[in-house]
C-alpha cells in the first residue's frame, strides 16, 4: 500500500506544484557534480576518457542512490507517514509533466501572436538544436517532438524504474539520464560520454517502446489516427540517431498525421495535416492521455504485485 500512496502522491504534487526551483532540485545538483568531474576527464587520451567516464557515472549514481536509500530506510522505521511524504517528494523530482506542458503551451501562445522571435528563444529550453532561424512549422514540429519524446525518458521510464527499484532506483536512473543530456554527444564528449550514452540507451530501451504503445492506445481517443500511429511507428522509429527516441516521436507523428522533421537528420511521419500552433495542443492531449494510460497500467502492476 505504501508504494501506491507514494506513487499517487507524487503525481498530485506534480499537478499542484510542478517542478521545484533549481536550488531544491536534485537534478540541478547532479548537473553540478557532473560539471565538476568533467573538468578532469580531458587530461588523458581516448582510453583514459572512456574509463574516466565509466567511473564518473558509477560514482555519481552511488552518490545519489546510497544516501536516498538509507534516508528512506531510516524514515520507514520511524514514521510511515513521513516516509511516504518524503519518498513522494523525491520521486516527483525525478519526473516532469506539468513543467513541460507549461513550456509547450507558452510556445503555442507566442506562435499564435506571431511572436516568432520569442518562440524561438523559449524553444531553446526544450530542444538542443539551433532555433534562431526556424520558421513557424519547424518550431511547431520541434515542440511536438519534445513533447512526444519526453513521455519516454521524462515520465514512463522514471515510473518504470520506480516500480522495480523504488525511489533510490529512480534517482540512479535520473543520474544516467542527466549524464546523457550533458555529455552523451559526439565530438568533444565522444569518449568521455560514450558509456553514459550507451547506458542511457540500454535503460530506456523498454520504456521507449512502452511509451510508443501508450501513445498508440491513446490515439484511439480523440481525433487522431490509430492506423497512422501504428504504420509510422514501425516505418520511421529507426530514423533517429537515438535507438529509443524515434519510437514515441514516430508514433505521435503518425497519430497526429504530421511530418516531424529535423533538417539534415530525420523526417518522421507524412505531411497530411499542416503544422499549426494548435498542433502543439493536440500533441499535449495525446501525450497526456498516453501518460494516463501508463499510470493505470502502473497502478494495476502495483495492485496485482501486492496481492500476488
Swiss-Prot record:
Q: Where in the cell is it found?
A: Cell membrane
Q: Which GO terms describe its biological process?
A: cobalamin biosynthetic process
GO MF terms on file?
A: ABC-type vitamin B12 transporter activity; threonine-phosphate decarboxylase activity
Domain of life of the organism in this record? Bacteria
Annotated metabolic or biological route of this protein? Cofactor biosynthesis; adenosylcobalamin biosynthesis
- Report the principal subcellular site: membrane
What's a GO cellular component annotated to this UniProt protein?
plasma membrane
Q: Give the keywords, sorted.
A: Cell membrane, Cobalamin biosynthesis, Membrane, Transmembrane, Transmembrane helix
The record's listing under NCBIfam families reads: cobal_cbiB, PRK01209.2-5
Task: Spell out the PANTHER family in the cross-references.
Answer: COBALAMIN BIOSYNTHESIS PROTEIN CBIB (PTHR34308:SF1)
* Free-text function comment from the UniProt entry: Converts cobyric acid to cobinamide by the addition of aminopropanol on the F carboxylic group.
Q: Which family does it belong to?
A: Belongs to the CobD/CbiB family.
What name is this protein filed under? Cobalamin biosynthesis protein CobD
